[in-house]
Amino acid sequence: MVIEKIWFHRHPLGYLLWPLLWPFSVLFGVISRSRRKAYQTGDKPSYRAPLPVVVVGNITAGGNGKTPVVVWLVETLQNLGYRPGVVSRGYGAKAPSYPLVVNEQTPAQHCGDEPKLIFQRTKAPVAVDPVRSQAVKALLEHGVNVIVTDDGLQHYALQRDIEIAVVDGVRRFGNQELIPLGPLREPVSRLDEVDFIITNGGVAKANEIAMRLQPTDAVNLKTGERCAVSKLTRLCAMAGIGHPSRFFNTLRELNADLVHCQGFADHQAFDAAQLNQLAQQGAHLIMTEKDAVKCAEFAQPNWWYLPVSAQFAPEAEQRIVDKIKEVMEPYGSPSA
């Protein structure tokens, strides 16, 4: 996409569009700062949940690897004996009504690809609502004792106890300009206020926690069969995520026999005819797990997805766990 080249690769068109886009970036900054201040001062009401809230988000537009962090966090909380629930706005989806609590039968087009993936991976209660406080209230009926929000760092209408920002360690912050001139939702200085900065790939800085996405074997969408990526011949790869090239590079690192790579927009909806035509360019079609939740109902026998999991150094993982325990302590024991 041209806009990504302008944001992250200093495309010449960016210099031509600068006079046009810069005033809108200034306006965006003024509005976002005044909006946040209104919540901080109480001029706008914010919701304080009766249980701890952990926000996982970012300061840039596009995918940074938040969802694997949310999955890791939920599984970690479950292993500690807590009962986490996840809230999301369900970006790119439209539910018949809100709040929507995700279950096995909920189609991804109603809840969103990321909430569906999180539910399938963790089996934790997941509630979707553009108004996140309403999603939290829906989860209170499901016996949860800690809330994890998928995205929502800028959703100041919901108060939080811990903020985790995920940064793309390769692309970082691009030209460091606010939307629409650059990718930033908030200035880079906003990261000085969060509890943890997790860097996905690249080289983590001194105040950041390095994360790597660890892939497993490919999984067949129809049968659930597992197979090493290197054993699948003539792969056609597709990715409808914020940074498709990251997925394709992961496949190359696994010695995949790639014959074609096709990137799509993040959260893009797919249909059977579109992907059947794409799959004809190879012997097998492989996609991200996030794409797979949208394609399962019309999947073909030669379609696969590649699960990935967030991994941290043990000491970094312990830092996050210790902070969670500290915040959770006033609310009682995990079984309370």
Curated annotation (Swiss-Prot):
GO biological process, one term: lipid A biosynthetic process
Alphabetized UniProt keyword annotations: ATP-binding, Kinase, Lipid A biosynthesis, Lipid biosynthesis, Lipid metabolism, Nucleotide-binding, Transferase
This protein's record includes keyword Nucleotide-binding: yes
Reaction catalysed by this enzyme: a lipid A disaccharide + ATP = a lipid IVA + ADP + H(+)
Pathway: Glycolipid biosynthesis; lipid IV(A) biosynthesis; lipid IV(A) from (3R)-3-hydroxytetradecanoyl-[acyl-carrier-protein] and UDP-N-acetyl-alpha-D-glucosamine: step 6/6
Residues the record lists as binding ATP: 60-67
One example GO MF annotation: ATP binding
UniProt-listed Pfam families: LpxK
EC number: 2.7.1.130
Broadest EC class assigned to this enzyme: transferase
InterPro entries noted in UniProt: LpxK, P-loop_NTPase
GO cellular component: plasma membrane
Primary role: Transfers the gamma-phosphate of ATP to the 4'-position of a tetraacyldisaccharide 1-phosphate intermediate (termed DS-1-P) to form tetraacyldisaccharide 1,4'-bis-phosphate (lipid IVA).
Family per similarity comment: Belongs to the LpxK family.
Entry protein name: Tetraacyldisaccharide 4'-kinase
Lineage: Bacteria, Pseudomonadati, Pseudomonadota, Gammaproteobacteria, Vibrionales
